[in-house]
Curated annotation (Swiss-Prot):
This is Pre-rRNA-processing protein ESF2. Residues 32-44, 59-78, 268-289 have a biased composition (Basic and acidic residues). Residues 1-91, 261-316 are annotated as: Disordered. Belongs to the ESF2/ABP1 family. Component of the 90S pre-ribosomes. Interacts directly with DBP8. InterPro entries: ABT1/Esf2 (IPR039119), ABT1/ESF2_RRM (IPR034353), Nucleotide-bd_a/b_plait_sf (IPR012677), RBD_domain_sf (IPR035979). The lineage of its organism: Eukaryota, Fungi, Dikarya, Ascomycota, Saccharomycotina. GO terms for cellular component: cytoplasm; nucleolus; small-subunit processome. It comes from Saccharomyces cerevisiae (strain ATCC 204508 / S288c). Residues 114-204 form the RRM domain.
Amino acid sequence: MSEKVNSDFEDFSSDEETDQHNVLIQTKKKISSKDDIFSKKVEDIESENESDIEEEQKQEEKEDVEQPDKENGEKLDREVEEQASSTTSLDLKTEKLRQLVKSKAAKKSKHKTGVVYFSSIPPYMKPAKMRQILTRFGEVDRLFLKKEDDQKYKQRVKGGGNKKNKYEEGWAEFIRKRDAKLCAETLNGNIIGGKKGTFYHDDILNVKYLPGFKWADLTEQIARENDIRQAKLEMEISQANKLNAEFIRNVEQSKMIQNIKNSRKRAGKEGESADSHPHREFKQRRVETSRANAPSDIKQQSSGSKDLGNVLTNLL
């Protein structure tokens, strides 16, 4: 039947109709292909969106993981920078100290040093003030002031004196010898001077230049004095320990004797009297003598007379 319909259609249709029919069929096919392409594009877009979403999620996870790492890294960087800054400051300080030491050593090598001695220091004068006074005459390298003894300090404070530190004597080293000589000549036996009304204006210093004396000699002397002081302290401590040990031994002995007496008192008076006045017995010999005027009862008889008497008694 279909074949017949087609044949009939072919008989009554013209060429133009057939061409239009073919075009319509082709357009339907083309439309169907466009729909397919659109659906494919939509699917591609959805897949791309899904992939983009997945990538964004992954990136967010990575960022979440990397954020604490970055924070830790920043903290570590800050700590490293702080340590570096502290080390740099310490290095700068050490370098400055080295430069100062080198400069002082260079000055000492160029010039011969001189040492002056102060037999008395004005009351309550500090080393900083003394250095300020001495720098008028030249550059001062080292300064040493000796404090008073602890015993003197305690007595002074106990008597109502000032509680400030007091120095008895001192030494100062000038980088140039001529400055030390000038200081000794000008300050010895004279007032310190300066502005009127200052605390140390009218104090007199006794300064002496020590020829041929170096700072090493002073350090040796101080070390020797410290050794002597330490030896005296050790001797005093050993004597005190001996006295303490003897005192403890005497106390223990007295306690022991007291305990013995108490035990005897508890035992009774008889036992106490017997123990306190013991009765001793001694073997007594007969008194004999060979003197002619001695009484007959104590007169010593000779051995011959004794034998004769025995013989006569036997015979009778």
